[in-house]
Amino acid sequence: MALVTSLITLAIFFMVAAPKDAFALRRAAHHHRILHHLGVLWNPLFRPSHDSLLRQNEEINRLDLPRIQDDVELEALKDSGALVPIEESESLKVEHGLDPSRRYCRPWTRDFLQDLSEVYYRQFHDQIQVNSAVRTVKVQKKLRRHNRNAAPADGDTASSHLAGVTVDLQRRGLTKEEIRFVEHYLFYLNALGLVEPEEERRHWCFHVMVSDRYSDWRQTQTIFPQSPTQEPVAAPVPAVAATAASN
């Protein structure tokens, strides 16, 4: 309870403390590229990038996690407890079209989902929705045939969904306030090296890879940063990779 209350305070703090024009520098750096989808401004804090995919895979390599090849490997990881089920609750729901066999993730990723969904629910009285979780290489290859923008199924930029550390959270339909709330929540965790997020435009979702350090960190409840002088103008790029390099 103390952790959830503190996380709510933290997210609200970042929202209130930041000036409205803080994204100006970041917009200029991207040559004022303003995109719209159904009339909604697309200007995410965490843009997908090659470097982000590299960082996600570096973290998976640090953890020595396998890229799950097929359903046989997937079921074995479930049986061993290495993958745990994502269960719906008052604060969390799962997209109805997501195959029940893939409603699984690593234990620390589920911890992250539980905390974020409870914080979000207390603030907005609505649920966070999980659109995607663990995938197999077989599934990822099939996805690539239908979506050329999907991450590869192998190599240094392979999809982090293949290791079960990543979830996609619904972004479509959220208000500006709700999006800003989630972005600032992720910004702080990213700065601590606990998550590596991206905001995907094609599927309008928050793609979030979670480090195993999250479970240990959440037990400390030492989550209050120094007061920011302005809203973040760009995501703290080297977060996960820098932390991994120190181990």
Give the role of each language-model region.
Residues 2, 9-112, 200-203, 209-236:
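Extracytoplasmic cell-surface/polysaccharide-interacting catalytic and binding patches
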Residues 16-27, 152-247:
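Catalytic cores and adjacent binding grooves of peptidoglycan-active enzymes
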Residues 100-101, 114-119, 153-155:
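Short secondary-structure capping micro-motifs at structural edges
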Residues 105-112, 116, 139, 178-185:
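Stable alpha-helical elements in mature extracytoplasmic
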Residues 116-124, 147, 173, 186, ...:
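Sec/Tat-exported extracytoplasmic proteins
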Residues 126-143:
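Acidic helix-start/capping segments at beta-turn-to-alpha-helix junctions
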Residues 141-156:
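Active-site-adjacent loop/helix surface patches within enzyme catalytic domains
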